[in-house]
């Protein structure tokens, strides 16, 4: 696997507080989309079948452009599927006109019923997608490029031991630093993963909606029904297949629709529940938070101690007396 440029520039003193497994993983399992030329992927595809899957809810303005872009990769990509989770706009119609195979969530495995949430749609997609590899792409992207797919496929087609590939990218938001994650990532998912699953601290954007995985892996894992699905799959892949089964790829820049603070609060609560359900009771808490900064075209870890001991109650301090007025 090609070495990500920042692994050569990394200041070892910067990562000394990072969990050693995470630091080692970041250095050897991170690459950039340019490391995976399209011609090389065609050579490595063989008889591997590849499905691009878009979960969609009211994404009429953006879904057709993404479908069209993904279809330019045929025959590397064998099918583009949109799973509609109950849109009230023309999402299904415009996706079908753009060439996607469209399924409604409620029509897939009807005997299981339908639950609300993104994870439900991704789970049901397994019952209609025919690929050996599934590439999930959010349907609200406003700047989709075909390399979003090819970058994620690269590590999977290069190494049979790779089971899941996560994307990371710049997010051009005024209140989000370049190279970091979104607000829910920085305020909820990253601190919790660093604390309870520190070996995953090297994952730049654990909530990225763009990722690819082998069907054999996805079929063996539970799917959180809501917005905790990405976090749950990441943790469960790590536990089931090991840290080196996961890779990540820098896709450059990504823009998409944004939600208000109240909606993000609900998302954060769902993710907290998903992570808490996977924490071993009594597990130690890692004392460092690893964040990421964009420098000269690459992303570099920045570590911060966060476990600061409490001061004791003042009444336990020898010689303490309340000052007189």
Label each residue range with its predicted role.
Residues 68-77:
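Short, acidic, metal-binding catalytic loop of nucleotide-sugar glycosyltransferases
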Residues 78, 92-120, 128:
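Conserved donor nucleotide-binding strand/loop of the catalytic core
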Residues 110-118, 122-124, 144-217:
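Acceptor/aglycone-binding surface of glycosyltransferases and processive sugar-polymer synthases
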